[in-house]
Amino acid sequence: MAGVSGCIKYSMFTFNFLFWLCGILILALAIWVRVSNDSQEIFSSEDVGSSSYVAVDILIAVGAIIMILGFLGCCGAIKESPCMLLLFFIGLLLILLLQVTAGILGAVFKSGSDRIVNETLYENTKLLSATGESEQQFQEGIIALQKEFKCCGLVNGAADWGNNFQKYPELCDCLDKQRPCQSYNGKEVYKEPCIPFIKDFLAKNLIIVIGIAFGLAVIEILGLVFSMVLYCQIGNK
């Protein structure tokens, strides 16, 4: 009977070790986003926070699953365990199918997701002029975004801040004279609202996510091939 190829065996181990490290990285980043002060400020409102943290929680689950699969693949390759390799193959196949399904649904419902983003941002404009403690955390997050994107407000510029415009020093101050500025309540502020910049930022990051997902899909297909070849070789020993 044919033996187990050392090349396939250690290629499988190396692949799964890298896969395991990717799981740790995803899990660590997702947990950091979940507990970091910056993200809590931006997603502090109930409407934004609930939907945003669902996505982060999904990433935490994905990272944990990838870690488990990487462990199964490493141990299955080194110990030449058909059971572990089969569990790895099934788990990886399910993840790949879920990725493909998510990609198809994302493409089909892209216009709907754009509408939800618009509605969420427009709905939360009123939080800029509110005075509650939870709203204040959201406002501080938007102030950070304003400094980053050199914009003011979400929809109507400085007017979105209402009476809170005087509350925050240096709010919307137009420090970059190459950007459009306007006079508001006696000082120069950025004219452009932040929604276009936020949407552009999300769109650019979506492209990055799609690229990462495509790269992961290629790696997962290689993992499926390696695991099945090794599984068959172990069975034929």
UniProtKB/Swiss-Prot annotation:
Primary residence: membrane
Extracellular side: 34-57, 110-205
UniProt entry tagged with the keyword Cell membrane: yes
InterPro entries hit by this protein: Tetraspanin/Peripherin, Tetraspanin_animals, Tetraspanin_CS, Tetraspanin_EC2_sf
Recorded GO CC terms: plasma membrane
Membrane topology designation: Multi-pass membrane protein
SUPFAM superfamilies, A to Z: Tetraspanin (SSF48652)
Transmembrane parts of this sequence: 10-33, 58-72, 84-109, 206-230
CDD domains found in the cross-reference section: TM4SF3_like_LEL
Family, similarity comment: Belongs to the tetraspanin (TM4SF) family.
Subunit record text: Forms homooligomers. Interacts with MEP1B. Interacts with integrin alpha3/ITGA3. Interacts with RICTOR and MTOR. Interacts with ADAM17. Interacts with ECE1.
Name of the protein this chain belongs to: Tetraspanin-8
